[in-house]
Amino acid sequence: MTQPSLSVLYSDHLRTLTARADQALQRGGFDHLVIPSGTTHYQLFDDRDYPFAVNPQFKAWVPLTRMPHSWLVYTPGKRPTVIFYQPFDYWHVVPDAPSGWWVEHCDIHIIRTPEAALPLLPARTERCAILGEAASALGACVPNNPAAVLDFLDYQRAFKTPYELAVMRLAQQLAVRGHRAAEAAFRAGQSEFGIHMAYCSAVGQDANELPYGNIIALNEHGAVLHYTELGRQAPQPLRSFLIDAGASAHGYASDITRTYAADAGSEFQALIDAVDAAQLRMGNAVRAGVDYKQLHVDAHLSLMGILHDFGIITVSPEAALATGVSAAFFPHGLGHLIGLQVHDVAGFAASDRGGRIERPDGHPYLRLTRMLEPGMVVTIEPGVYFIDMLLDEVKKNGHAASVNWDRVAQFAPYGGIRIEDEVVCTDGAPENLTRPVFAAP
């Protein structure tokens, strides 16, 4: 993506954001939208700060992710104003003055102290919708996070602009570069920690810059859904590798998962291939007007069909779903919205005026219950796992006969399988953001 084209896309993106903000402010009865970037937070009984995490509402407007004590101010009919904190400091590296393809579209004021922002903020704070954490308060400018404004903006965030899709594609490219390096490190016999370091080096981002903690799981560690321990010694023998890792680009996240078998001729590889084929079909079902809840239920049936074919369960997919057996093997949701945040907001929103669409009974970890519409980007991440705690529940609930325990014992040392792509819902066929990048040379 060239700089000029990003500039053009950003200009259009900003027009969309201002139109949304105009409507949100009208609904809430406010004259100004004020968004602090956030503040630094210090560890308890210490003078060391935590890694800074920018306010997602702030980085929706400008691609600044490491700028505490900065502000975005928008008043309908005017250009957005960015109050950019650039302190005098010899202890730390001072951020460069704003530059690049976005600055021509905003009015920028540079401040040297956090307090210097105050006279640049709207004087009548009661007329401001101020979106941020309480710690960002400055004088009378105290975040109020009005529901009418947040509900509208969060709901609309599901619909990505061409600019957002462009930078999300960049995040895909970075992450796939890391995934390739990670697979090579796995094939070379590296430890989880070594694989993680290979990933970070290939992406060019450290743990504080990545959108979430890398899941680098060898062998049975793949049965821990959010395994982040990073063992320093590679297990012997090396059987399997599950990697769930993304990258950041201009404030937007990617989220990709792959699973590999050490032995390409093993039954575990055959199981991976079956889940991979099913995952592609699930991604192709991302269509406008489809209920994501139904996609999730359909995923359960598809995965249980695979387990039945492999002799791991002894009952029909429908019976496994009805009795809760399927949840022991596939205990998480099919996916979620993604964008500025890995688990992007408003996945349960009934409308842009609030309300909530509940999860289906028996599926407490599904993160998206909305109808799919053009512009949404969702993850599709089916998984099959061999988790002792959940399989013990199957026995306790009287469904032991539904499972072939000898087959479970054969697959348990591999941990589990998860395969995840990002998919754009369009007016027609969906666009898979992830697969073409892996397929490229």
Curated annotation (Swiss-Prot):
Keywords per UniProt: Dipeptidase, Hydrolase, Manganese, Metal-binding, Metalloprotease, Protease
PROSITE patterns assigned to the protein according to its UniProt record, in alphabetical order: PROLINE_PEPTIDASE
Enzyme Commission (EC) number: 3.4.13.9
MF (Gene Ontology): aminopeptidase activity; metal ion binding; metalloexopeptidase activity; phosphoric triester hydrolase activity; proline dipeptidase activity
Binding site for Mn(2+) 1: 255, 336, 381, 420
A Pfam family it matches: Peptidase_M24
Cofactor binding mode and count: Binds 2 manganese ions per subunit.
InterPro entries for this protein: Creatin/AminoP/Spt16_N, Creatinase/aminopeptidase-like, PepQ_N, Pept_M24, Peptidase_M24B_aminopep-P_CS, X-Pro_dipept-like, X_Pro_dipept
Known cofactor(s): Mn(2+)
GO BP: any one term: proteolysis
Residues binding Mn(2+) 2, per UniProt: 244, 255, 420
Record carries keyword Metal-binding: yes
Cellular component terms (Gene Ontology): cytosol
Catalytic activity as recorded in UniProt: Xaa-L-Pro dipeptide + H2O = an L-alpha-amino acid + L-proline
Statement: the UniProt record of this protein carries the keyword Protease: yes
Coiled coil feature spans: none
Family affiliation: Belongs to the peptidase M24B family. Bacterial-type prolidase subfamily.
Summary of the function given for this chain in its UniProt record: Splits dipeptides with a prolyl residue in the C-terminal position.
Protein name as it appears in the record: Xaa-Pro dipeptidase
The organism of origin for this protein: Xanthomonas campestris pv. campestris (strain B100)
Lineage: Bacteria, Pseudomonadati, Pseudomonadota, Gammaproteobacteria, Lysobacterales
